């Protein structure tokens, strides 16, 4: 697949503080790439450098193999969507969406053609005459996205665009965004601290920590084969067993619980159930290990057949293939 954006030895410093240490990254055309990490990890700074709102201290950013260092944001073939929608309150939905095309003096016939297309894409045709105050938060976000895609940018940059919405609405819009990206074929670069959001939408995820990309891979590879201790503990839930100079990561869903007097060959550890949390489709069971200052989490699903209670002594085990060995 064709490379659309390339970051070559990019570094960002503010005074003497290195915010983004030097690294390189290539992004493919039509890809949905998510920059995922905790607050302050540098993901928004990186996005702003791609957009042109911040300049890298060293290194170069290329779009279609052309350097962007001296190209202002408004001349880059990119648009950006923020968490704050920044809609014009006195304009209707269609007036907000058309604003950029009017500023570029695109012909009226072409404006209307593109407007009808994007209104269908974002499911706002019936709401085109409403003003922002007459819309829900999710509808306002659709307007912001429509305004960003109507001029067919090569790249769409999204800085936590769903962060202000409630959980159920976020879930719904995640699916809509992914389908929209597939239909349009536009490269999406998406910033979030929400792991579930990143997993649901991305072709690849770049997990960031302290300005560095710890790992970049597909959601499945990030989850099943973390390369660093940070990725293993930041993405999802994990049990980290530190023994013999290594870290072995085992996901809670891979931990099996057995009666303490069952087949000893299955057992790796013995312990006592310290707590259990009911979450509808599963229970999180916490086991305090014997002779170790460690609590292990296991997932128990409906139909497992054993109803463990707090205080029960249990044995735990897992397949060796479910361990991920990580550097210390």
What are the language-model segments listed below?
Residues 36-38:
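The feature captures the beta-strand-to-loop junction immediately N-terminal to the Walker
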Residues 59-67:
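Conserved ABC transporter NBD signature motif
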Residues 51:
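Helix-to-loop junction immediately C-terminal to a conserved catalytic motif
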Residues 44-47, 143:
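ABC ATPase nucleotide-binding domain helices that frame the ATP-binding cleft
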Residues 247-328:
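Non-catalytic connector elements of ABC transporters
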Residues 32, 71-227:
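ABC ATPase nucleotide-binding domains
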